[in-house]
Every structure is written in structure tokens, then in C-alpha cells.
């Protein structure tokens, strides 16, 4: 709801021009390039500092100005890969991209077909720089109403309270556990299928999720297998998750999930 309501006392709660994007914001435009310079001076020799991106989905910013900042960093310290923004726009100075979509090419993630004999190599292979799939998945899980009790002190779960009132109105409040388990099982299947699809794509440089926890900063995004307090929802264990998201994952390619008794199951193994 916060995107549709103008709140004069809280301008940061609307994306319609507030706050102004980089390149249009004098105070930030002075701070950000100076801070970027300080970052590479302070952490430039750290072995984990392999990539730098100015920010996330900077769609309301001036990409030409930000590109100048990136070029300055590349000239000063070319030891890592640089990018201007995740998603939104790809610029000539970008040395990698984190995006939902490769321009004029196609989407970076999705589940295709009725089996596992598929990937997104036809899209990724056309890119001239490494591509990381951005905020993949985001499959929601029906909430448990007892999570509301965790919000104490200055915290109130108004988003969950609103959803619970809808459930009360529709006489299904008592079914939250069943809906939670069913949607959680579906979430696991979808994440597994999506991640394995990316792992089957040789040219995919990686993927990132919105969050493994629920995100309550925009009303609600119940997309995690952990809740907003980092507590397990009881959907999946770490050991189970690592079976399909790990350094090495055995994969099986087969063209359909349903086989008849008179058919011989065939699959191609990929690691």
C-alpha cells in the first residue's frame, strides 16, 4: 500500500521522485563518489573485494554521471569488476551485470517446460560480460498468525494483522497452518527448479535472491523460508537446501516428470 499513498510527513516512503536519484541530488552526488574512492583505498587489497556496484535498481538516477564515477574507479584500481547498478540499465563501462533481463535478448531466470532438460544458455551465451540473475524466485509462503506475537515494544505487525483480518472475514483464519505447509512445499519445489535451471546454464555467472528471510520493508514480502526474525518456518532444513544450492550439485536432465509404466526412464547426468 505504501507505493500508492502519498505521505507528506514521510517522503522517503514514496518512490515517485523522492528521494531524488543519484546525479539529481546535490548532497548525495558529492558524497557517493568520494565514498567510493574511500572504499577502494581502505579495502582495495582485501582478497574478497572482487566486485563493486554503486547500488541496487537505481532507475531514477543519471546513468551518464554514475558511469563517470565508475570510470574513475576503473582507472584508479582496475583489479576488480565494476558495475553501475543492478537491473534497470546496462552501460558501456559495466564489466558485469546483475539483472532480471538482458536487453534485446531475454529474461535471466524462469522455469521452462515440464521436465528438467532445459536451461537458459541461449540467452546467457549472447552476453559479452558476466551476467548474474537478479532477485530470483520471490515465491511467497502463507503466514502463520502466531508470528504476530513476536512483534513487541515499538514493533507492530500491521501487515500481518491486515492479512489475518481478511482471513477472519473469509472464515479461513484457522487454516493458516495448512496453507503455510502447502505453500511452503510449493516454494521449495519452485526454488529447487529455478536454481537447478541456472546451474545447468554454463554461461550463467551466478544468481542472487531477494532474501532467504521475509522482507517487511515494503509492506510485506513473504518470500523467505525463514521469517523476518530469521527463525525457520519449518519448510526446509539447511541440509536439504544445500542438496540443490551448493558448490557442487548433481543434476539430472529429463524431458518430463510423469512417466508411464510401459516407458523407460531416461536421463542425462550433469555435474
Task: Give the ranges of each region predicted by the language model.
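Substrate-binding/catalytic cleft of secreted carbohydrate-active enzymes
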Residues: 1-226
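Aromatic-rich peripheral "rim/lid" segments of glycoside hydrolase catalytic domains that contact
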Residues: 72, 76, 210-270
Amino acid at each position: 500500500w505504501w507505493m500508492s499513498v502519498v505521505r507528506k510527513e514521510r517522503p522517503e516512503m514514496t518512490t515517485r521522485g523522492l528521494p531524488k536519484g543519484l546525479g539529481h541530488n546535490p548532497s548525495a552526488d558529492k558524497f557517493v563518489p568520494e565514498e567510493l574512492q574511500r572504499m577502494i583505498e581502505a579495502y582495495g587489497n582485501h582478497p574478497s573485494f572482487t566486485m563493486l556496484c554503486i547500488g541496487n535498481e537505481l532507475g531514477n538516477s543519471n546513468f551518464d554521471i554514475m558511469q563517470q564515477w565508475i570510470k574513475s574507479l576503473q582507472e584508479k584500481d582496475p583489479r576488480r569488476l565494476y558495475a553501475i547498478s543492478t537491473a534497470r540499465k546496462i552501460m558501456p563501462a559495466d564489466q558485469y551485470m546483475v539483472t532480471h533481463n538482458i536487453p534485446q535478448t531475454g529474461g535471466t531466470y524462469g522455469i521452462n517446460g515440464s521436465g528438467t532438460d532445459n536451461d537458459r544458455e541461449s540467452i546467457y551465451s549472447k552476453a559479452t560480460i558476466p551476467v548474474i540473475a537478479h532477485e530470483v524466485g520471490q515465491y511467497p509462503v502463507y503466514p502463520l498468525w502466531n508470528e504476530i506475537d513476536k512483534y513487541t515494544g515499538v514493533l507492530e505487525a500491521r501487515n500481518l494483522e491486515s492479512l489475518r483480518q481478511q482471513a477472519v472475514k473469509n472464515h479461513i483464519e484457522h487454516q493458516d497452518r495448512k496453507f503455510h505447509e502447502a505453500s511452503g512445499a510449493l516454494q521449495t519445489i519452485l526454488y529447487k527448479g529455478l536454481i537447478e535451471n541456472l546451474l545447468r546454464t554454463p554461461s550463467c555467472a551466478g544468481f542472487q535472491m531477494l532474501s532467504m528471510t521475509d522482507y517487511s520493508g515494503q509492506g510485506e514480502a513473504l518470500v523467505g523460508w525463514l521469517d523476518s526474525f530469521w527463525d525457520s518456518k519449518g519448510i526446509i532444513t539447511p541440509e536439504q537446501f544445500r542438496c540443490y544450492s551448493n558448490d557442487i550439485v548433481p543434476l539430472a536432465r529429463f524431458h518430463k516428470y510423469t512417466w508411464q509404466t510401459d516407458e523407460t526412464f531416461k536421463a542425462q547426468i550433469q555435474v
